[in-house]
Amino acid sequence: MHLKPYWKLQKKEHPPEVSRETQRTPMNHQKAVNDETCKASHITSSVFPSASLGKASSRKPFGILSPNVLCSMSGKSPVESSLNVKTKKNAPSATIHQGEEEGPLDIWAVVKPGNTKEKIAFFASHQCSNRIGSMKIKSSWDIDGRATKRRKKSGDLKKAKVQVERMREVNSRCYQPEPFACGIEHCSVHYVSDSGDGVYAGRPLSVIQMVAFLEQRASALLASCSKNCTNSPAIVRFSGQSRGVPAVSESYSAPGACEEPTERGNLEVGEPQSEPVRVLDMVAKLESECLKRQGQREPGSLSRNNSFRRNVGRVLLANSTQADEGKTKKGVLEAPDTQVNPVGSVSVDCGPSRADRCSPKEDQAWDGASQDCPPLPAGVSFHIDSAELEPGSQTAVKNSNRYDVEMTDELVGLPFSSHTYSQASELPTDAVDCMSRELVSLTSRNPDQRKESLCISITVSKVDKDQPSILNSCEDPVPGMLFFLPPGQHLSDYSQLNESTTKESSEASQLEDAAGGDSASEEKSGSAEPFVLPASSVESTLPVLEASSWKKQVSHDFLETRFKIQQLLEPQQYMAFLPHHIMVKIFRLLPTKSLVALKCTCCYFKFIIEYYNIRPADSRWVRDPRYREDPCKQCKKKYVKGDVSLCRWHPKPYCQALPYGPGYWMCCHRSQKGFPGCKLGLHDNHWVPACHSFNRAIHKKAKGTEAEEEY
């Protein structure tokens, strides 16, 4: 399938002047012949393979490949179409280039029917702007129409390399950013030609090109979003939970994103295209909730100057139907059940340039967000995102189920630890508040490093007087909780159920009782002083709560019912209380494998088998006193009293010859496969046939004198 780099006359039906000229001066008139034969619309089927392509060479694909028929495409004569060569220089050349070193190959060279060069034209991808034709597409993975088989190098490599570089420049300029609403299926429509005046309607793009195309459009969308959205609110990502409870995704923007709305923000859009209205509604609800709480600032609240100049990380609030449960560092709060008030969004990304302008609103939204929060539902989990911290300065809080609180505090060297954590630990007495603080310095970072963020999550649970535990679950009963306690009876039943449990579980119950007492006393006094849980006590009770989280949920009725069911299902040991003569009769009816199992299971059964000399029902030991001392034919073991062992070794005395090679040895013939010795591995000392007359005579003589006990 190699194309020759020299001119070769393929058909004799050509005009004589063309064939003579190509035979005499092939290299001088090569470019002219290429322009006349390939650029014109009248193309004969015996086009010569060109060794090099000019910059203006552009060839149209064949619709019908026929060797002797002139294909009229535009209705012009060959002379007229050859004069229009210079007007078509902007059209892209339909060439195939194999790698960086090889030159372009003329894939429109069609010769004899059945030739391999004709197949090349069949397999060439149709990337011209006028026609799509009836050609095959060999693969949609070919990049830039590149063929997959090896071709010979063309003669003029310099021109080929220049043309390849031009094609790559054209491809890099072709992808114009478009709105993100256009899906992946429209990627092939937006491929613009070299001159920029046309599109390739059906061009198959590779995966790499589609990915680059989508990245270009995503960056264009981000630039447009930074112009439209003044504050760049957090975009919501649905991560597999219920439809009404999305999670807050990451949103990053430049430090001056609030003062300069036209600046591009590195905003990653993660919501599915099927639910855009739900995302917009939730963003509007978040904004309205933040605006609602702006007027509730207290005098001793958190200052913006030292902690609000940070970037927003990622908070995952999952698996909840009561979505009004927590807030992020910038006042972003989930509120699907609140009223929709689509006002301007409260600032999510606050840079140093807008610190003075946004501080009162942000402080009010931050301080007022803990007023009407319902208790923490099940499955809320906060964790650390990718963080750049000093060594030993991380905080991770994980609430794995609704009954235990796991907190790890390693605030050692954070520059904002003394002020931030004290504010994050203070919670009002009537709610369970979940805070998430994402603090990353923006001043020392360029836009490439802005994706590194810290997510510090702190969860502190408070207990009311009427509900003396942190087990405040939903109103509807959860499936599978039949034997579990209601939340009000948890502490009283847990203390009496786990009397024999570990020391950690008792400490956990004492911790909960102490927390309940503190909250009750605070509510009776009516003071608004928040309850501050010390970090050392929370850190010390981490293994305690985790170890006892599953034991303390079960009621006493369930334990009693389970014990009764276990007693009914437990096998009763009646056999050990039977008299010996009944047990001996039962054992003599058992095969060898069953007796082996009984002997190895219980010492009492082993004593009975050996003392009463119990033989298995399928035993092959000879009972005749003349042969009872004979060993096993297979393993040469002699019989002892109470031996119920299996024979573990089989000789293979029989040779099975094969016609095509060495045979194999067998322990028995095929007709004796049902014999117990082959299947079970029983001991056998039958050396002499029992029905022999000599054996009968000897047996009669020894019958009167035999006084030994039969084995």
UniProtKB/Swiss-Prot annotation:
Which residues constitute the signal peptide according to the record? none
Which InterPro entries does its entry note?
Answer: F-box-like_dom_sf (IPR036047), F-box_dom (IPR001810), FBXO34/46 (IPR039594)
**Which keywords has UniProt assigned to this entry?**
Ubl conjugation pathway
- SUPFAM superfamilies, per database record: F-box domain
Sequence ranges of Basic and acidic residues compositional bias: 10-23, 354-364
Annotated region (Disordered), positions in chain: 1-36, 249-271, 337-372, 494-529
Q: Pinpoint the F-box domain residues.
A: 572-624
Answer whether the UniProt record assigns the keyword Oxidoreductase to this protein: no
Q: Which PANTHER family match?
A: F-BOX ONLY PROTEIN 34, F-BOX ONLY PROTEIN 34/46 FAMILY MEMBER
The record's subunit annotation is: Directly interacts with SKP1 and CUL1.
The protein's job, in short, is: Substrate-recognition component of the SCF (SKP1-CUL1-F-box protein)-type E3 ubiquitin ligase complex.
Which protein, by its recorded name, is this?
Answer: F-box only protein 34
Protein source organism: Homo sapiens (Human)
